[in-house]
């Protein structure tokens, strides 16, 4: 029987929960919210698990988004996943939101995933055939004018187009808990808290032209 995974995501503008088994979605719930995840997440977990007709003893692991994204959302998701995993003695899988966008893209070439920071710069990472070819980084719009041969995807694309005129865009919906569950099926879970990917400017080198 395919292992069942409970997946949680509240790293960006939505909060979502899914129970998946391989590529199959057993139950899923999502809600748009930029705040209030701490109050909404556990009731959503209870609802989704009830509809999936699973107990924690039926799960192989818990998957959670590690960001980058909303600091509060990432922190809430990781804390919830860690608490549930400890209570049920389950391992965890952390999934980068940047990698999740690349995974979701119906695009096999060179892709630059660009996510909103709500500031003057962007979270970003470079991929080729869905595999990372750079570490995650923070960059301003001028940096992306130096990139040649890359398409762009992510929730920062619209602002990037406005700032730089970039036109090669891969249309990719922002990932949700379903995507995290599918990705986690191919990863090795561990009995430790996944590390958050906050990418604050103080922790990285700001790329400029």
Model regions and ranges:
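Phosphate-coordination loops involved in phosphoryl transfer and adenosine-cofactor binding
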Residues: 2, 59-62
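DPxDG-like acidic metal-binding loop motif
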Residues: 61-92
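Short amphipathic
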Residues: 27-30
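Oxyanion-binding and handling regions
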Residues: 1-25, 36-39, 93-209
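Phosphate/pyrophosphate-binding loops at sites that engage ATP/ADP/AMP, CoA/4′-phosphopantetheine
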Residues: 45-60, 146-150
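Phosphate-handling active-site elements
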Residues: 50-58, 86-95
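Short, well-ordered amphipathic alpha-helical segments that serve as non-catalytic structural scaffolds
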Residues: 37-52, 98
């Amino acid at each position: 029987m395919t292992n069942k995974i409970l997946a949680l995501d509240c790293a960006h503008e939505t909060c979502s929960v899914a129970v998946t088994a391989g590529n199959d979605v057993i139950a899923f719930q999502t809600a748009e919210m930029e705040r209030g995840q701490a109050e909404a997440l556990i009731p959503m977990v209870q609802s989704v698990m009830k509809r999936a007709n699973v107990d924690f003893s039926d799960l192989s692991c818990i998957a959670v988004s590690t960001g980058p994204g909303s600091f509060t959302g990432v922190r809430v998701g990781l804390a919830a996943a860690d608490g549930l995993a400890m209570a049920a003695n389950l391992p965890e899988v952390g999934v980068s939101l940047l990698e999740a966008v690349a995974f979701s893209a119906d695009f096999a070439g060179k892709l630059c995933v660009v996510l909103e920071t709500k500031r003057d710069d962007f979270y970003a990472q470079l991929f080729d055939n869905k595999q990372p070819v750079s570490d995650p980084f923070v960059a301003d719009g001028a940096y992306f004018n130096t990139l040649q041969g890359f398409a762009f995807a992510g929730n920062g694309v619209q602002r990037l187009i406005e700032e730089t005129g970039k036109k090669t865009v891969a249309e990719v919906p922002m990932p949700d808990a379903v995507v995290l569950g599918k990705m986690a099926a191919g990863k090795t879970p561990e009995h430790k808290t996944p590390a958050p990917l906050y990418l604050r400017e103080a922790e990285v080198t700001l790329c400029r032209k």
